[in-house]
Curated annotation (Swiss-Prot):
Any single GO BP term: protein ubiquitination
Function: Substrate-specific adapter for CUL3 E3 ubiquitin-protein ligase complex.
Species in which this protein is naturally found: Gallus gallus
Main location: nucleus
Protein's UniProt name: Kelch-like protein 15
Amino acid sequence: MAGDVEGFSSSIHDTSVSAGFRALYEEGLLLDVTLVIEDHQFQAHKALLATQSDYFRIMFTADMRERDQDKIHLKGLTATGFSHVLQFMYYGTIELSMNTVHEILQAAMYVQLIEVVKFCCSFLLAKICLENCAEIMRLLDDFSVNIEGVREKLDSFLLENFVPLMSRPDFLSYLSFEKLMSYLDNDHLSRFPEIELYEAVQAWLRHDRRRWRHTDTIIQNIRFCLMTPSSVFEKVKTSEFYRYSRQLRHEVDQAMNYFHSVHQQPLMEMKSNKIRSAKPQTAVFRGMIGHSMVNSKILLLHKPRVWWELEGPQVPLRPDCLAIVNNFVFLLGGEELGPDGEFHASSKVFRYDPRQNTWLRMADMSVPRSEFAVGVIGRYVYAVAGRTRDETFYSTERYDITEDKWEFVDPYPVNKYGHEGTVLGNKLYITGGITSSSTSKQVCVFDPSKEGTVEQRTRRTQVATNCWENKCKMNYARCFHKMISYNA
């Protein structure tokens, strides 16, 4: 019928328009503008330039003097760079090399041809290496390139190769104080020993004597407590900056106090001993193989399906209780192989320091324990109930981290093992477990603010106190389960 309307679209229209402009360009037809750059003249079509570049679109459509000009002089870019950009606007392809990318990027930024800018950035980041890193940094900075993801990828390379780069004079020359500070504050530098970061800072300072005025500020981003004492003595205290910088001397004194305060280290939270780690790490500490063999490996999940093996205490313990205090790991009790070839409950306690990857034997618990529960409140690690091969008990004791000693506190209400604990709001919650009669639904809360007197804190005391309080029971009896507190 006459009133019916049907629409049709061409699948080749866009291609034919582009091909049409290319044909006119190659034949030199209908060219209506000449662009003069340096001593070279480039003829083109205003319409095509305006569709490809916001710079030219504004030039030819807004109230600008160039709108009606046939010849336009452009300054601030090279003929070589613009020739590649113009070819891209007509043909959609561009060839890049380290010899030409500088001029092409300059021209693309000038005419606001973002697609070519992205190509240049991708090319540069694919070619980046130690030898040209400083040059690429300078290039991106010179043209204020702000393409999404480019700076992040550049920084990722810099952080991954920070120490090797800091041995190169060209990189040292270009790296600014502000950039250096931001890199030193970044936890992605964790792959480098802290002493190497300090030596890198020294190299930057020595490169230009005028930089020494920044010493006190920069040095605060070095974490001296992550170094070994020998490194501080031999490489920090002997440097010329130790004499020059009051802040450096203060940082060294603080680190030496930290090294000497062995037992207090887990409670000394400060920037200087904060582990450089860009994300939380997963570690597996010890375990069973079958029913009798002990797996003594400590494994760190480096990346998916890749585990790193760490050193561990040279004692054949199996299923230990574990407590974490400021990224120090305490392994407590469990069982160990005795001289009779059998496993017996252990009272041993070990502390792992991931900063130095070292283990330290701490004071033993007052009694051997296995299948017990632990919790950390303030400066104390609490060990609740548990058993040996011969008996189950309800004694509760706590470890004073600062004093490296154990003392008994108010006992758990009943003999129990196989229970679990977690801390919430400075209170220790104990759930489930096995009593003399059955698996338990019990939930009991320990409030350290209500602890009894020293005389009441005996291994077998039956003095009733207000320290332990029963809460609503669980719906199901549980034992050998796991429990965590959320938003504690």
